[in-house]
Amino acid sequence: DDEMHIMVGYPWFAVRAPDELIALPGCTLAIKHREDYEAIMGTLVNALKEYVETGTKHATIKEIDIPDTSLWAIWAIQQYKRFYGIGECRERYGEIVKFIVDAIRNGRIPNLYINENGLLSTNGQNSPVTWLSATIDGRPIIPRTGYIVEYNALWYNALKFAVALYESDEMMAGYVDDLNNLAETVKESFIETFLNDYGYLYDYVNGAYADLSVRPNMAIAIGLDYSPLDRRQRKRVLDFVTRELLTPKGLRSLSPKSYGYNPTYVGNPIEREYAVHQGPARPWLFGFYADAYFKVFGVSGLSFI
């Protein structure tokens, strides 16, 4: 067919929606392959809309049903704005951004629930719902569930980005006000829910349980264009990430000080599955770290990065 995709890994991995969206800007926009970006994003957008509207999953794109796919789609579109400006971004992708935001607000994304405090929650007890997707016998090794830190950082970012797309349109003034009000609620709830007394962010919060594992998902929360944290709060989180997760190869998937740390991906398939997200570094997360560093330190951070 005429579709274009990015494979997660050849030949053993398929096309997976969240991974494809995370990789898309770097694989296309960063090397001036605009047409490839638009072709791949067009396929993804159509697949996502079809899934939300009818429940039909794309034949080739796997994990279109993972709840954060919609959030990563908006993030990937936001990167298009970085390269080609807000006007072109709004013209080409404004409709799908609004579609996704409204679908989330109206509870139309399966296993993605908006709560009275504005935060999003999901059920990851029985199957993985984030990139920490290792399983044994089909069950997630890291059962992140409830309020997940990067979900809600991406949600706040999505709301503020939608505001930026539509704030110049007088006909959308009421809609923009609604999104701004919701974003403010999300911001307050995010800080109350995730920012702990140690100065970093809980990885996920499920009822009375708050996961203290120091993981790189907090780097996503402080590296987004719109973060719910102020500069001082971001600096404290950044210090934790720098001290416990930063390596020359990327960010560790778990701090050496956290329970279960295992930096070596060796052994039989079960041993490797247990280890894969318990310490080994991920290069792609360094992009969020670099963005966060520049947001805190400005151009003075260039020599460090």
Which positions does each model-derived feature cover?
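Extended glycan-interaction surfaces of carbohydrate-active proteins
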Residues: 1-14, 38-58, 109-146, 185-284
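Acidic/polar, glycine-enriched structural segments that form the non-catalytic walls/loops
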Residues: 1-12, 87-88, 98-106, 166-168, ...
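Aromatic-rich carbohydrate-recognition surfaces in CAZymes
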Residues: 14-20, 24-129, 148-152, 156, ...
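Amphipathic, soluble alpha-helical interaction motifs
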Residues: 26, 76-79, 107, 161, ...
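Solenoid-repeat scaffolds in large eukaryotic assemblies
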Residues: 37, 176, 183, 234, ...
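Short amphipathic alpha-helical coiled-coil/interface segments
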Residues: 97-100, 179-194, 305
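Active-site neighborhood of glycoside hydrolase catalytic domains
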Residues: 150-189
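Extended, well-ordered alpha-helical segments in internal regulatory regions
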Residues: 161-167, 221, 225-228, 288-297
